[in-house]
């Protein structure tokens, strides 16, 4: 059971956030092994630092911010693994109807992929994303707009 402070234990943390963090990292990194590493490092940082949060939303935002930073670090490093194929995505439980969108999303530049995933997949507002990424809300709105345009081109030009 979690402590009275509302802080999650390791098992509860994985149950509560593990799947969402993995999806997020998988879209960012396009590689299951790297995504697993990023999630593990994110959760380990949480356990090591024992941060206190005012709300579950603040805790979730902190975890996604740390995960985004881990993903960026991984993307900066030399590629260790090839990108996921559509067959590998299907093997990881993605529905066939989602594969085209996931593939298109994974082909976008990182800054658009990150904004679109945080907003549309994880449900963060533009203000929350701006705070997480150290950008202005208007910059995030522009990234979302441009990202949607690029995603549309990626989906419809690929047919």
Where are these regions (language model features)?
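Structural recognition of an alpha-helix C-terminal capping motif at a helix-to-coil junction
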Residues: 23, 37-44, 57-69
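DNA-recognition helix of helix-turn-helix
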Residues: 68, 72, 133-158
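C-terminal flanking helix
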Residues: 22, 43, 109, 113, ...
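Arg/Lys-rich amphipathic alpha helix in sigma70-family domain 2
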Residues: 48, 54, 64-84, 146
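Sigma70-family region 2
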Residues: 2-4, 30, 41-58, 77-79, ...
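A short pre-motif secondary-structure segment
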Residues: 115-119
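Internal acidic/polar
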Residues: 73, 80-105, 125
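A short, charge-rich alpha-helical start-of-domain segment used by transcription regulators
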Residues: 1-23, 36
């Amino acid at each position: 059971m979690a402590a009275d402070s509302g802080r999650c234990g390791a098992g509860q943390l994985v149950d509560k956030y593990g799947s969402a963090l993995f999806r997020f990292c998988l879209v960012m990194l396009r590689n299951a092994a790297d995504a697993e590493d990023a999630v593990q490092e994110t959760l380990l940082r949480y356990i090591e630092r024992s941060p206190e949060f005012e709300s579950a939303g603040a805790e979730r935002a902190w975890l996604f911010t740390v995960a985004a930073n881990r993903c960026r670090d991984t993307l900066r490093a030399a590629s260790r693994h090839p990108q996921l194929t559509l067959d590998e995505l299907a093997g990881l439980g993605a529905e066939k109807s989602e594969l085209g969108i996931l593939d298109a999303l994974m082909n976008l530049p990182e800054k658009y992929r990150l904004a679109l995933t945080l907003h549309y997949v994880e449900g963060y507002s533009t203000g929350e994303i701006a705070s997480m990424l150290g950008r202005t809300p208007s910059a995030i709105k522009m990234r979302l707009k441009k990202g949607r345009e690029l995603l549309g081109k990626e989906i419809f030009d690929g047919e």
